[in-house]
Amino acid sequence: MILSLLVTPLLGVIGVILSGENTSLQKKVALTSSLLTFVLSLVLWAGFDSNYNGFQFVSSFPTVTTQEVVGVDGISLFFVLLTTFIIPICILASWESIKTEIKYFLIAFLVLETLLIAIFVVLDLLLFYIFFESVLIPMFLIIGIWGARERKIHAAYQFFLYTLLGSLFMLLAILVIYFEVGSTDYQVLAAADISETRQKILWLGFFLSFAVKVPMIPFHIWLPEAHVEASLAGSIILAGVLLKLAGYGFLRYSIAILPDASVFFTPLVYSLAVISIIYSSFTTLRQIDLKKIIAYSSVGHMNITLLGLFSNTIQGIEGSLILMLAHGVVSPALFICVVILYDRYHTRLLKYYRGLTQHMPVWSIMFFLFTLGNIAVPLSANFVGEFMTFAGAFQQNPVLTLLGALGMILSAAYGIWLYNRTAFGAQSKYLAPMGDINRREFMTLVPLLFLMFLMGIFPNLFLDPMHLAVSNLLI
C-alpha cells in the first residue's frame, strides 16, 4: 500500500510527459494522479488499526547494501494524508495562473509529492535526511522559475541556502550516530543506549537543522521572502506541508532517539519559541503586504506547536499534531484568498483594499471563516490544537506558556484587524469593483473549509489513531 502511494505520483509524471504539448491534458493527468494518491491515502487511513501499538503497512525493498523499510504509525499517517490532500489543491489553484513551462511545473509538484510522502514513511534516519534534502530541489525550481515577482531568484537561493546549511549539522549528527550505534534504522536507534553527553551534542545538530525549517527566530528570514515571491501553489505547499517537516523531525528523531537531551534542552526550546511567537505576532501587526501578514502568522503558529511537542505530555503532543494539521489547512486557504484578490487587482498592499463585502460577498464569507479558524475560535481545528497544546505546555512551564499564550491574543488582534480593513467600510477609491470568486477558486477552498471544521468538531477521528504512537514518546 505504501509503495503504491510512492509510485502513483511518479506514474503521473510519466503520464504528463506522454501527454506531449497538450497542456490541458497534462493538467488533467497530474490532477487525476494526485487525486488517486489521495484516495490511496484514505484507504490507508481506513485500514489503520488504532489499537495496534507499532508501525503498520510495513514494507521492505532491497537497496545496494541492505533492506530498507517503510511504514506508518499514528503520527506519520496524518502527515501523509495532509500531503496527498494539499497537492491536488496546489494543482487546481494554479490551473490558470501558470502560463510557462506547465509540463515541468506539474512534474515538479508530482516529484515533490513522492519525496514528501517518503519523508514521512521511511524508517531509516539516513533515508529521512536524503529525502529531507531532496525536497529542496523541486522547491527551489518552483520558487525560482514560477515565482510571482522580480526577486524570486533571490528568494529561491535564500530558501535553498538557509535550509541546506542548517541541514549540514544534521548530517554530521547522523554520521556520529552511525559510528556510535552501527545503524541508522529508526527502531534500532529508538532502543539504543546513547550517553547523555553524546545525546546533547547530537541534539544540537538536529536542532540547528529543524529550527531553520520551523522557522524559529532568528532563522526565519527566508520564510516571508519565499512566500512573497512564490507562486500561489508554492505558498500553499510551503505553508501546508514543508513547515511541518521540522515538527515531524523533532518528534520522530530528536525526542524519540535523544530523549535525555530533549528534556535538558526543553527550557531553551520554550524560550526561543516564546520569543518567536511574540516577535512574529507584533511583526505581523506592522505588515502592509497581505502575503507577509499570513507568512509571519505562520511563524507564530508553528512555534506554538513546539511548546506542545516538548511538553512531555500526551495532551500537549497530540495538540501540537492537531495544530500542525490545522495550520496545514487554514494557512493555504488564507493564501488562496489573498491571491484571489491579487489576480483581480494586481496588488497585495493592504491600503488599497476596503469594502470588499459589497462586490465580493462569497470571498468575504470564505475569508471570514478562515480568519476565524486562524485565530482559533471554537469548532475550528486550530482551537482544538491550541487548547490542547497550551494545556500540555502549562504542565511543563507555566510562566513561559502564559507568555506564549499572548500569541493567541495578538493573533486575534491582527486577524480581526485584517478582516475589518479589507471587507468592511466604504468601497476603496483606488480599485474598481471586480467579480466574486469563480467556480474553480470556490472548489479549492471548500475542501479546506470542510477539513478545518471536521477536525474541530470531530477531533477524535484524528486523536484516537495517534494516541498510542504519542504515548510511546513520553520520557
Feature-to-residue mapping (PLM):
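Acidic, glycine-rich loop-and-beta core segments that form the ion-binding/anion-interacting portion
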Residues: 224-226, 230-234, 242-328
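Alpha-helical transmembrane segments of multipass membrane proteins
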Residues: 13-17, 88-92, 114-118, 141-145, ...
